[in-house]
Regions:
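Charged, glycine-enriched surface loops/patches
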Residues: 118-142, 159, 163-175
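Conserved beta-strand termini and adjacent loop/short-helix elements that scaffold enzyme active sites
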Residues: 73, 142, 177-179
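Catalytic His-Asp segment of secreted/periplasmic serine-dependent ester chemistry enzymes
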Residues: 146-220
Length: 220
């Protein structure tokens, strides 16, 4: 298993090196971030939010966390391999003092062959990639949320959450935040009134739940 992970890490490393040589998925999103940074250089040593559309759509995330400096680099539709591919563009240049990650939902939704174990293994690759360059930077992983439109995938989501939580329990400078159960009602179904009409993305009430769970763990 260790050899397999090393091979996968090597493959993803090669993808990172070659990401700029061809137009990989989400290339335009990444270039938009770079253009934005060139026009308005972001602060160094801020808190970096990175991941998929739950962050992309959190456009007013800074308003939820006054007193903290947030850089939001969520790009909608992305999966963990995409975050890995563009780590040199959207993680390391910012020298963040803390990294908050939400990603993995799209991995499960993309293919029937992707399991909770797959998501965990992909996250571990991302984690180890970050640790190679930033051995002590605090990392927060937000659990996969219970999206009504993806309710049929909940077992895979829960497996991914459990495996990532167990993995992080053995690491240093990390926090696993369980939003999954916080977003369920008394009937153990996703709460009503916290999602947009697509039953996938959250409205302000949904993000308020995230704010309550995340803020105690952010670094000043």
């Amino acid at each position: 298993m260790k050899n397999i992970k090393l091979v996968l890490l090597l493959v993803f490393s090669v993808n990172i090196l070659h990401a700029q040589e061809k137009k990989s998925p989400f290339w335009d999103d990444i270039q938009a971030f770079k253009k934005q940074d060139s026009v308005q250089p972001p602060p160094q040593h801020a808190i970096l939010f990175v991941g998929s559309s739950s962050f992309t759509k959190w456009k007013d995330v800074q308003d939820y966390f006054p007193g903290y400096t947030i850089i939001n680099r969520g790009f909608g539709g992305s999966s963990l391999p995409d975050v890995i591919r563009y780590a040199n563009d959207i993680i390391f240049p910012y020298h963040p003092k803390q990294i908050v990650i939400y990603c993995g939902e799209n991995d499960v939704a993309a293919s029937d062959t992707v399991t909770g174990q797959t998501v965990y293994e992909r996250f571990e690759i991302l984690f180890e990639l970050i640790r190679k360059k930033m051995p002590t930077v605090p990392i927060i992983f937000i659990s996969l949320k219970p999206s009504p439109s993806r309710w049929q995938l909940r077992q895979k989501m829960m497996t991914a959450n459990d495996k990532i939580k167990d993995f992080l329990s053995k690491q240093k400078h990390v926090v696993f935040i369980d939003v999954y159960h916080k977003m369920l009602g008394a009937d153990d179904l996703p709460m009503k009134g916290i999602y947009l009409e697509d039953n996938l993305h959250m409205n302000a009430k949904g993000y308020a739940i995230w704010q309550k769970e995340i803020e105690p763990h952010l670094l000043k």
